[in-house]
């Protein structure tokens, strides 16, 4: 498997190996003491493999490609999309963490913007891979800085981690908040405060 490390995305050129994934799930069922040939589990390896192909679909698509389309709107004020539903997978335990992402940017001097759905799509593609929330937040911000050439970017993610809710410390409902600020949002306190006020306002 070859990977590109030319930016913070991790993209694989390999295709999803359905047969290998099915075999791995079957072995896991045996390892925990189950019978993978009993009626309820007979098709489970194939179902789980297909599910993981979807859950990790972001490994096979470069999020930068999503941001190629730009529109000349001569817009010089903040663009913010709030409460983007987000599902990802903790790379430490391979269980879900889920919540919402808030993504904002100030267009560059050329006033060009990208489609609002593209921001949600970038969140989705970075989330659909083995992740940690801190890295996910930064990757989204860096992709926007890299492709949109904006004056500033802010990304805030609020998520519940099932690895904290289902096992270990077992604290369901605990929410982890991470942020990444770039450009003007990092250097200008007023811009950052305005963005955070809009994000926190319900």
Swiss-Prot record:
One of its GO terms (biological process) is tetrahydrofolate biosynthetic process. Belongs to the GTP cyclohydrolase I family. This is GTP cyclohydrolase 1. It catalyses: GTP + H2O = 7,8-dihydroneopterin 3'-triphosphate + formate + H(+). GO terms for molecular function: GTP binding; GTP cyclohydrolase I activity; zinc ion binding. The gene is folE. GO terms for cellular component: cytoplasm. Pathway: Cofactor biosynthesis; 7,8-dihydroneopterin triphosphate biosynthesis; 7,8-dihydroneopterin triphosphate from GTP: step 1/1. Zn(2+) binds at residues 90, 93, 163. Toroid-shaped homodecamer, composed of two pentamers of five dimers. Its EC number is 3.5.4.16. Keywords: GTP-binding, Hydrolase, Metal-binding, Nucleotide-binding, One-carbon metabolism, Zinc. InterPro entries: GTP-CH-I_C/QueF, GTP-CH-I_N, GTP_CycHdrlase_I, GTP_CycHdrlase_I_CS, GTP_CycHdrlase_I_dom.
